[in-house]
């Protein structure tokens, strides 16, 4: 923007970005004076929620990011997933106009509200599924799911490949066929689910806002 050009050249800002994908895709012109990575963290409400390894949620999937982040891809894949996961339901965020096919496929609009409702919905889900999107520079929704030890299946679009350790905390699919297969695997194979969940529990609270604060101070070279 024209009004920002003079302050930009005057103050020479270094851009602070949220991850590797964000770093790689930031244009040269908007990071002319440099760029650094500062990974964010989920809120303490997610970090402080206790997760029971032995709890087996119903075989449901959840998608808690925006509908413009490849939801159509997801709903099309879910139509195929549903054929092998007959008892499963998919919970997505409103607003969205469900088609008759969506309703038949047990796609359900979540009730949006307090954060505790989101936490409850995530804890009661077997898998978090999201293709990802080129505009996702971090995807806090996926990070919140990971903090609550919900395995993730993604296509890895945008920054989503950064939120998943393939085969350890979820799966990064190479194509839609794999996306469908990996989702069905977690929904129907309790051993796979428990293995992924155990790995996630071991990584729980690996990054919180104390870490973010410390890293920011280092980036800014500030003495506490």
Where are these regions (language model features)?
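A short, active-site helix/loop in glycosyltransferases that binds the activated sugar's phosphate group
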Residues: 2-35, 47
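Conserved catalytic-core segment of nucleotide-activated headgroup transferases in glycan assembly
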Residues: 52-115
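Acidic donor-binding loop of glycosyltransferase active sites
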Residues: 123-137, 150
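A charged, aromatic-enriched C-terminal amphipathic alpha-helix characteristic of glycosyltransferases
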Residues: 174, 190-221
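Short beta-strand->alpha-helix junction loop in the catalytic core
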Residues: 21-22, 37-50, 96-98
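Short glycine/acidic-rich beta->alpha loop that forms part of the nucleotide-sugar donor binding site
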Residues: 136-139, 146, 156
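Short alpha-helical segment that forms part of, or immediately flanks, the ligand-binding pocket
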Residues: 119, 142-147, 161-162
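Short acidic/histidine- and often glycine-rich active-site loop of Leloir-type glycosyltransferases
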Residues: 157-167, 171-172
């Amino acid at each position: 923007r024209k009004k920002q050009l003079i302050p930009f050249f005057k103050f020479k800002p270094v851009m602070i970005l949220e991850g590797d994908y964000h770093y790689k895709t930031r244009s040269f012109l908007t990071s002319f004076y440099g760029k650094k990575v500062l990974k964010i963290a989920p809120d303490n409400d997610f970090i402080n929620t206790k997760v029971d390894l032995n709890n087996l949620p119903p075989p449901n999937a959840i998608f808690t990011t925006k509908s413009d982040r490849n939801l159509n891809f997801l709903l099309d894949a879910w139509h195929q997933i549903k054929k092998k996961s007959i008892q499963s339901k998919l919970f997505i965020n409103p607003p969205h106009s469900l088609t008759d096919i969506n309703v038949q496929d047990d796609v359900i609009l979540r009730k949006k509200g307090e954060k505790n409702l989101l936490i409850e919905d995530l804890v009661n889900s077997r898998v978090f599924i999201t293709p990802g999107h080129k505009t996702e520079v971090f995807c806090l929704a996926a990070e919140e799911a990971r903090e609550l030890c919900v395995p993730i299946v993604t296509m890895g679009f945008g920054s989503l490949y950064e939120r998943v350790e393939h085969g350890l905390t979820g799966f990064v699919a190479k194509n839609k066929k794999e996306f469908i297969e990996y989702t069905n695997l977690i929904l129907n194979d309790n051993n796979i689910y428990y293995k992924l969940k155990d790995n996630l529990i071991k990584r729980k609270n690996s990054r919180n806002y104390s870490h973010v604060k410390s890293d920011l101070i280092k980036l800014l070279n500030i003495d506490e």
